[in-house]
A protein has these predicted regions:
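Post-Walker A alpha-helix
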Residues: 110-111
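Glycine-rich, often acidic-flanked micro-motifs
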Residues: 3-8, 14-17, 88, 92-101, ...
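Conserved lysine of the Walker
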Residues: 107
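Long, basic/Gly/Ser/Thr-rich N-terminal segments
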Residues: 1-60, 244-261
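Short linear motifs at secondary-structure transitions and domain/linker junctions
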Residues: 19-33, 58-67, 73-75, 96-97, ...
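Walker A (P-loop) phosphate-binding loop of P-loop NTPases
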Residues: 104
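Extreme N-terminal, non-catalytic leader segments
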Residues: 36-93
Length: 261
């Protein structure tokens, strides 16, 4: 059954549920959303004791879904003993692969291109994880105006113009199989394994920049997973090669799309 939720929480009380649809999440805690009409209210106010989320009623649903919900999700994750990080993820039958890159690394553009060929996208921007499982994010990808892409999304977030691509509903949780780091290159597209030391170094840089993952042990656990570096030129013409590398990885690790059981 598909329910309204993302990032490890079910959401009730929202006037609309666009871009929020996952299956197999009855065990996720529920946040009760209430609209707040006060002009001086914060955009979002989370009370974990009562599991209530107050949303200022002039906040557009598109803004709530992204980026605001991701910020709340990180707080909820920590309160539940989970963790989070700035990353996307794609699904294969052997599990999900986290996709990590600094701002401007083309993460969302790559995920949108993978979605075009039917690769299931677990999340675009925030990855919540716990006990070896990752939680599905909102069912959309936001692309900046300067992002090279095929096809058109819909315009959202007037304060920060982007185009939004809708994603289909997906299973709520997936085993975490490995990590892909993104990097631009002046040469050919290539994917190479990273050793444990380099995996830790890159995760520490991410933590220093974004503040997550918070738990040092969670970071070390991530670094023990198979870790790869995908290097590719800043060219839409080379996107097919990058997509092919990720698709090959998913096939070699057992094919696409299976949920955690």
């Amino acid at each position: 059954m598909t329910v309204t939720g993302a990032y490890g929480v079910r959401l009730s009380g929202l006037p609309v549920d666009t871009w929020l649809g996952v299956s197999g999440a009855p065990h996720w805690p529920e946040l009760s959303c209430e609209m707040d009409s006060r002009s001086d209210a914060p955009e979002l106010a989370l009370d974990m004791d009562t599991r209530k989320l107050r949303v200022r009623d002039d906040i557009a649903h598109s803004e709530f879904v992204h980026p605001l919900l991701g910020r709340v999700a990180s707080q909820v994750a920590l309160a539940r003993g989970a963790d989070a990080m700035h990353a996307g993820a794609v699904a294969g039958s052997a599990g999900a692969w986290a996709v990590i890159g600094p701002k401007g690394a083309g993460k969302s553009t790559l995920l949108a291109s993978l979605n075009d060929i039917g690769v299931p996208i677990v999340t675009d921007d925030v990855l919540v994880f716990r006990d070896g499982a990752v939680m599905a994010g909102p069912r959309c990808i936001d692309l900046r105006p300067d992002a090279p892409r095929r096809g058109l999304g819909i315009a959202v977030r007037p304060s920060d113009p982007r185009s939004r691509i809708a994603l289909p509903p997906i299973a709520a949780e997936h085993d975490l199989a490995g990590v892909i780091h993104l990097e631009w290159s002046s040469g050919e597209t290539a994917m190479q394994p990273l050793d444990h030391r380099d995996a830790i170094r890159r995760l520490l840089i991410l933590r220093s920049d974004k503040g997550y993952p918070r738990d040092p042990q969670a970071l070390l656990d991530l670094a023990t997973l198979p870790t790869l570096l995908l290097k590719r030129p800043r060219s839409l013409k080379q996107m097919d090669a990058a997509v092919a590398q990720v698709e090959r990885l998913l096939c070699e690790s057992g094919g696409r799309a299976a949920a955690r059981r």
